[in-house]
Design a protein with these regions (language model features):
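N-terminal small-residue-enriched
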Residues: 1-246
Length: 246
């Protein structure tokens, strides 16, 4: 199963490009390639990297840090990731699905730097969590939005549009530079992990084998495991194209 998606508050976004990308991945997956167990280069697409970003999302939650359950608690100002990694939350992006003028507590929305040049700049907070931590809210207080529970419970820290700054390498150049490795494009669910340590373990739903800089086929029955913080501190390159995921 291969899927693609995009989203915007505008009605005129380019849906044809989504279909084109899906068809391209279908063609690449016609051959099956074998992959051996072991450590190797891994190229995560914007879809495949979600388990790592979810671990970071938990680690950067002010409530998680306040409770001492975050591996980044007490590490503001410290280098924890590769210097090329920059992450922010920005609810002011035009037409993005998570954009909003205020959060669920009436606080004006604003861009919040979380990781800059691999350094922890801060956490995201709601009013209550910020008060307990002795700091100011970042305008990230939201209630749950599941079916039937829009106004149940208190607001809690939540991200709006989490964004990873693009790097300098094209996807083709990154693939060409790989001697042997895999591309993780889609994963099955969020996998399993431990937010206390940043560990993750996830089954690859759609992935490809790379040999001598070329995609040689689709991989099956493959699991990728590691630690999100260690992985993002051992980066070979970051793609230069910003993509949206949900």
């Amino acid at each position: 199963e291969v899927f693609g998606m995009d989203g915007s508050c505008r009605s005129d976004f380019d849906h044809r490009s989504v279909a084109h990308e899906v068809l391209k991945r279908v063609r690449l997956g016609r051959r099956i390639a074998k992959v051996h167990t072991g450590r190797m280069q891994v190229l995560f697409t914007h879809r495949g990297i979600m388990p790592l970003l979810m671990a970071l999302q938990s680690a950067l939650n002010g409530k998680t840090a306040l409770e001492g359950a975050s591996p980044l608690a007490g590490r503001i100002g410290q280098q924890v990731l590769d210097p090329r990694v920059c992450i922010c939350d920005d609810p002011t992006v035009d037409w993005a699905l998570g954009s909003c003028p205020i959060d669920g507590e009436g606080v004006q929305s604003r861009r919040t730097p979380l990781i800059e040049a691999g350094i922890v700049k801060g956490f995201y907070y709601d009013l209550q969590t910020a008060g307990r931590a002795g700091t100011s809210t970042t305008g990230n207080g939201f209630r749950r939005t599941g079916a039937g529970d829009y106004f149940e419970g208190q607001p809690t820290p939540a991200l709006t549009n989490a964004m990873v700054a693009p790097g300098s390498e094209s996807l083709d150049d990154m693939i060409t530079s790989m001697d042997e490795g895999i591309i993780v494009d889609q994963v099955m669910g969020a996998g399993q992990g431990n937010i206390l340590t940043g560990d993750f373990s996830v089954n690859v739903h759609l992935g490809f084998k790379v040999e001598k800089g070329k995609i040689v086929g689709r991989i099956k029955d493959t699991l990728v495991a590691g630690n999100a913080i260690e992985t993002l501190n051992d980066v070979a390159a970051i793609g230069n194209r910003a993509e949206r995921d949900f």
